[in-house]
Design a protein with these regions (language model features):
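Core subunits and conserved enzymes of cellular information-processing
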Residues: 2-217
Length: 217
């Protein structure tokens, strides 16, 4: 496993630029499309909502708890480099959320057209997260869990994302109407495929080693 000093020295401005760009795209899409059109999610976000509905656990407790579990697994299987890169991405993501919230909506309200919202939202999430993962980082517990699943199973990244999303969305049918879940399936399918495509651009298919995610030249 790399030392902390080595990891910091390898963290280039180019890598930082791409992490910032990825978090900007991701947060822009979630703020201007997902939140306005009320598109529900799979993965950790969906599990937080599920736990809140059936167990009464507040999101303020469930979300950090689930993220901690996912990142603990990521540290074990993906290493310190991944954790530090994910921390940079998380700070950048929070900053961009704050930035977008200070402006009025920048895209038309797609609430009357949920299919369009699901497709476009999936594009923003897929490209944004794909860029972040390509730099060896994570935007949240969802990405960390998907990368660990890929590490352990050898699945393609898209399949790992879809697996976690479909399990949670399937369980969410216990309290969310099927029509709403259907649009969520559209957005998670689009985003999963795009994450896999963007993350793999210019690279042969690889599995992350124990000490890091992918390194960018």
């Amino acid at each position: 496993m790399k030392s902390f000093k080595k990891i910091v020295s390898d963290f280039t401005m180019k890598r930082l630029f791409w992490l910032v760009l990825g978090t900007a795209i991701l947060s822009f899409g979630i703020h201007n499309i997902h939140q306005r059109a009320a598109i529900t999610e799979g993965g950790v976000i969906g599990l937080v909502l599920l736990m809140n509905h059936w167990l009464g656990i507040p999101a303020s407790i469930a979300s950090p708890l689930l993220d901690f579990i996912c990142y603990a697994l990521a540290f074990k299987f993906l290493g310190l480099d991944f954790i530090l890169t994910a921390a940079v991405a998380s700070v950048s993501l929070a900053g961009f959320y704050r930035l977008w919230e200070s402006f009025p909506p920048m895209l038309p309200d797609l609430t009357p057209w949920p299919l369009a919202a699901a497709l476009l939202g999936g594009v923003f999430v897929g490209i944004g997260v794909g860029i972040i993962v390509r730099q060896g980082g994570s935007s949240g517990g969802d990405d960390a869990l998907a990368l660990v699943i890929r590490q352990l199973t050898g699945w393609k990244l898209a399949r790992s994302y879809l697996f976690t999303d479909l399990v949670v969305l399937g369980a969410s049918l216990s309290y969310i109407p099927a029509r709403r879940i259907a649009f969520s399936l559209v957005t998670v399918t689009v985003s999963s495929l795009l994450i896999d495509w963007v993350q793999g651009l210019g690279y042969d298919e690889k599995i992350h080693g124990n000490d890091a995610a992918k390194e960018v030249e």
